[in-house]
A protein has these predicted regions:
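Ser/Thr/Pro/Gly-rich, low-complexity intrinsically disordered stalk/linker tracts of secreted
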Residues: 1-141
Length: 141
């Protein structure tokens, strides 16, 4: 009996945490981690789009590259339209392998990004998209 390879389903998960995690907190550190299949640990060409819920604040209405890290490095560009934040990822460098496997992309918004928690305690959805991958993370404050 011949065993044929079974393609893996496109799956992924996203987690989010805010420090402090209290309702109404201003200028929080917001950490998003997306886990999905990557080629050689590379998250993909992007763009990375993060859509914050209407209850969250982004003040000022722009975010500097220094106020955000993607896996510990600044994004190539950051743009903000309302509560939608779009990142261009730095270009991939070096040799590309052909291995597809589980990986993680972590986005950290520093307090300087000006993101504030919702005023009311509850659970809020943050939508994230990169390439063909879409995620929903739930922030509880």
């Amino acid at each position: 009996m011949q065993m044929l390879p079974t393609p893996l389903p496109r799956t992924g998960s996203a987690l989010v945490a805010s420090v402090p995690a209290t309702a109404g907190a201003r200028r929080v550190t917001l950490k998003l981690t997306m886990r999905y299949e990557m080629q050689c640990g590379w998250p993909g060409a992007g763009p990375l789009v993060v859509s914050l819920p209407a209850a969250m604040r982004v003040v000022p209405h722009s975010i500097t590259r220094a106020a955000v890290s993607l896996d510990g490095k600044p994004p190539a560009t950051v743009s903000v339209t309302g509560r939608v934040i779009v990142f261009t990822l730095p270009p991939r460098r070096g040799v590309t392998c052909m291995e597809i496997g589980p990986g993680a992309l972590t986005v950290v918004f520093a307090p300087a990004a000006g993101i504030g928690n919702p005023a009311k305690a509850g659970t809020y959805r943050i939508a994230v998209r990169i390439g063909a991958h879409s995620f929903t993370a739930r922030l509880t404050v």
